[in-house]
Amino acid sequence: VDAISPGINLEPVFKLLNDPTIIKVFHACRQDMEIFFHLTNNTPKPVFDTQIAAMVCGYGDAISYDKLVKQILGIEIDKSSRFTDWSQRPLSNTQLNYALSDVTHLRKIYEKLKKQLRENGRETWLVEELDFVTSTTTYMIDPEKVWLRLKVRSGRPQFLILVQAIAAF
């Protein structure tokens, strides 16, 4: 699905994402959840985030998809198209193949991580992490706190007060 294709109807995708009987598997889903929240005022549920599951299983705090695929499946993923111009249409065959390879292994990774979580008795740990990521309150913007999302390099109180006021505006 080319989500930014002119005139595309994303309703079938949103219907799938909101189907509570289908587990949606992502890797590092937080930005996706934020986008879905701002588009639909909701987040997909249930979800399984392979990056969060990998953290719970001991693969590190923020393992990349290609490293996770390499560690669990022993497969190298070509990431050479990662920084190409994805706004340019039509997408090249190289970009399409990259996009396909970026999701091809999700099901196998999901199955292996699910098994590891069960064997290690850590399924509830994952549920707690995913509850936060899929909670709509996680993505609600509080104007009084939005300034905390900015990377401010100054610790001067007057400057911070000004940044806070501008951000809330």
Where are these regions (language model features)?
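Conserved DEDDh/DEDDy metal-dependent 3′-5′ exonuclease domain
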Residues: V1-Q116
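Intrinsic structural disorder
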Residues: L17, V25, D49, D131, ...
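Mixed-charge, glycine-rich, non-catalytic linkers/tails in nucleic-acid processing enzymes
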Residues: N93-A167
